[in-house]
Amino acid sequence: MGVLRLAVCISGVYAAFLLWAIAQERLSKPFPSVHPHPHQQPHSPSDPPPGDKFPSPLFLNFAQALASSLSALCYLSFKAWRDGWKGRGLGQLLGLKEVFGKSQTALNGDAKANKKESELNEKTKEVVEKAPKPPKKSLLALLVQVSVFQTIASPIGFLALRHISYPTMVLGKSCKLIPVLLLNVLLYRRKFSPHKYIVVALVTVGISMFMLFAETSKKKKGGSDSMWGLVLLLVNLLIDGLTNSTQDQIFSSYPSYTGQQMMFTMALTTQIILLPLLVLPLPTNPISLLAHLPPPFGSSVPTSTLSFSPPAALESISFLLSHPSALAPLFAYALLGGLGQLFIFETIQHFGSLTLVMVTVTRKLFTMLLSVVVFEHRLTKGQWLGVGVVFAGIGVEAGMKRKDVMKKAKKD
């Protein structure tokens, strides 16, 4: 059952986010307007048709968060209906009792939590030895912590991309397994079996080689990478590690709290954070706010006129009305993101963040291998070597799991 569930989760993540990436790329391109701009110059048939780009990334994030919360709610409702509801109210369905009150785990003491955690670890084989745990935070505090991490991670990633090349960003993201592993050990004092460190090292090196030796890297590299951009990339990786390790801590400390309940809470929190930013007028140049502060804060900033842009929600709705061709990719982007999140949180709950990150960082590799078979694309020798290193890491993991299963079978 565990192998089948993992296979379904991996297939769901790959399929949903492969199509999601296509929708995301389409949303980054211009859309033709049904109302042509005045004084617009005619274009030749060889030129791409003129258009406008989607005005607000915040609106896109809000749409995906809304779709994620609805997807989680539908999943939880269907699961409760299949189980006959059993007297479940909305609070129990969404896990609100665990979030805002004493959870059953807390009421029954640490003994029951430790027993459930050891059973979970026996299934995933990620944690093989219980370590002394730091004082348990409330579930609400941990969820707020994850929400803050998720909210600031994306803007920092976009800011880093302004100062480094895209291949450098992809290469850095391929090393995401390292901060997830280290922060689980350092922050929450988890102990992993020695082979886990070998697997993480092999997969990270293999994925890095696959990205580094790609032929497109040289073509796309273009500019140089600044030190500031590399610092932002490291901060982004650190935040990713904090997010995933804290999610592991939540499922370890609160076994009755499910992945889809966390997904709903995270998506709802994101909507609450983004809503004021969408409906309120924001300064067109936030740095200009410093000019209006009293000395010494505003003394070194040139005086500038403070202007505000229209609310992003109104701009986005107006854009969709005048550019109806953007509706389909926006709907696909939000829906596929919501469906993909279902598989992501299912993977975290049952197999841990290390397995999830291993799935996500190898997604591009397996997509490229599929393109080699289907479209006869070619890989460089360095990329094939990277593929071999990744499969060596996967082989080590599979071999150790088989060894554990055989040991358990002999005991029984």
UniProtKB/Swiss-Prot annotation:
Function: May be involved in specific transport of UDP-Gal from the cytosol to the Golgi lumen. Involved in the maintenance of optimal conditions for the folding of secretory pathway proteins in the endoplasmic reticulum.
Gene: HUT1-A
Keywords in alphabetical order: Endoplasmic reticulum, Glycoprotein, Membrane, Sugar transport, Transmembrane, Transmembrane helix, Transport
Location (main, coarse): endoplasmic reticulum
Organism annotation: Cryptococcus neoformans var. neoformans serotype D (strain JEC21 / ATCC MYA-565) (Filobasidiella neoformans)
Glycan attachment residues as annotated in the record: 244
MF annotations from Gene Ontology: UDP-galactose transmembrane transporter activity; UDP-glucose transmembrane transporter activity
General remark: There are two genes coding for HUT1 in strain JEC21, due to a translocation and segmental duplication on chromosomes 8 and 12.
InterPro entries recorded: SCL35B1-4/HUT1
A GO cellular component entry from the record: Golgi membrane
Membrane topology term: Multi-pass membrane protein
TM annotation in the entry: 3-23, 58-78, 139-159, 197-217, 222-242, 262-282, 325-345, 355-375, 379-399
Protein name: UDP-galactose transporter homolog 1
Region span, Disordered: 31-51
Top-level lineage group: Eukaryota
Annotated family: Belongs to the nucleotide-sugar transporter family. SLC35B subfamily.
GO BP: any one term: UDP-galactose transmembrane transport
Location of this chain's protein in the cell: Endoplasmic reticulum membrane
